[in-house]
């Protein structure tokens, strides 16, 4: 009787996933639970995307197609797509000779990056630019610059470039004054058909350098920057797929244009990302604490370069996902589900989870 009920449940889920507007993949995915986290076999992933072995990053397992090459290692959270670094929510695991990736990373990172075919309802018309810090809050400080000034300089240059492309721009601040994080989010949430880009510059060890871009950590996951493991819904998680698509478009262009060290697209629960109801990223343009990098960041030429990269990324994002879908064969829906038929004892929780 139990087997029959499981069969009916699997059949019902398959029918739901194969309704019009949903892409059903050939084959099945087996979901396994490892230390409380659901994983899928990477061999199933490669087969689903029709990936074959490729020459990729040294020391990594690399698979791909003509368009993408993916590289990763067992027991690490680094995940590379076309040599751009992402940080997974859970490490790649090796069990019984099989490499495995968490199902939440498949839904919330890998699939939206490899197949950004989802489409938002309206085209992007407005960009909310948030120059971090301001007023008495200087952010990171060195002998060469204050972070609040660098943030505002890049933001103003970005505004000009976006306006030249026909976008409306809203600045959370356009001078040296302080805003609370809640005020910044309130401004962004009041602007329809927009994205939110918070501009910052980093601080750390003297030798630390490079660019990193943050999006909100998926529900129920943690990260070095997530502060806590959260299972409740946050408003920002309603745009998980759009967040990672926007981060990919901006970050890849910034790394390519600047030649900076790629510190990756990472997950966090920064306050400005948690309660925002628009696609949102937090961009870190380099390290104020690194004297050589800070001197470079203080120049107009480098500020223009960063602003131009962010502008290009926003335009590319708009052209890719902010248009009516020709076919609803989306890699992800609003809930971020992987569109494939799956079997195994954990199929129901996998297919329903947001």
Where are these regions (language model features)?
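Bacterial N-terminal signal peptides
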Residues: 8-20
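Bacterial N-terminal signal peptides that target proteins for export
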Residues: 1-9
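Active-site-proximal helix/loop segments of hydrolytic enzymes
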Residues: 145-354
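Sterically constrained small-residue positions within well-ordered secondary structures
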Residues: 16, 118-120, 204, 273-274
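Primary recognition of N-terminal secretory signal peptides and signal-anchoring hydrophobic helices
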Residues: 23-143, 153, 161, 165, ...
């Amino acid at each position: 009787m139990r087997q029959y009920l499981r069969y009916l449940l699997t059949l019902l889920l398959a029918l739901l996933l194969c309704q019009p507007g949903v892409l059903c993949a050939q084959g099945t995915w087996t979901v396994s639970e490892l230390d409380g986290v659901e994983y899928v076999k990477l061999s199933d992933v490669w087969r689903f995307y029709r990936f074959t072995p490729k020459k990729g990053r040294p020391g990594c397992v690399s698979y791909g197609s003509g368009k993408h090459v993916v590289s990763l290692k067992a027991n690490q959270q680094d995940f590379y797509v076309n040599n751009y670094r992402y940080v997974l929510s859970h490490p790649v695991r090796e069990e019984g000779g099989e490499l495995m990736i968490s199902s939440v990373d498949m839904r919330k990172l890998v699939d939206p990056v490899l197949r950004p075919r989802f489409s938002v309802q309206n085209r992007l018309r407005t960009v909310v630019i948030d120059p971090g810090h301001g007023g008495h809050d200087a952010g990171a400080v060195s002998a060469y610059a204050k972070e609040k000034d660098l943030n505002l300089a890049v933001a103003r240059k970005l505004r000009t470039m976006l306006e030249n492309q026909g976008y409306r721009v809203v600045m959370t601040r356009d001078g040296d004054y302080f805003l609370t994080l809640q005020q910044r989010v309130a401004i962004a949430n009041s602007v329809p058909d927009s994205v939110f880009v918070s501009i910052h510059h980093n601080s750390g060890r003297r030798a630390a350098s490079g660019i990193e871009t943050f999006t909100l950590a998926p529900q129920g996951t943690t990260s070095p920057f997530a502060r806590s493991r959260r299972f409740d819904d946050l408003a920002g998680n309603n745009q998980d797929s759009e967040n990672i698509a926007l981060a990919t478009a901006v970050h890849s262009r910034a790394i390519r244009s600047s030649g900076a060290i790629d510190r990756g697209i990472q997950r966090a629960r920064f306050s400005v990302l948690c309660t925002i109801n628009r696609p949102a990223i937090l961009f870190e343009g380099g390290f104020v604490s690194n004297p050589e990098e800070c001197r470079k960041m203080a120049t107009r030429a480098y500020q223009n370069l960063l602003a131009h990269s962010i502008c290009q990324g926003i335009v590319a994002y708009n052209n890719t996902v902010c248009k009516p879908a020709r076919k609803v064969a989306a890699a992800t829906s609003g809930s971020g589900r992987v569109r494939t038929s799956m079997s195994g004892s954990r199929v129901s929780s996998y297919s329903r989870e947001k």
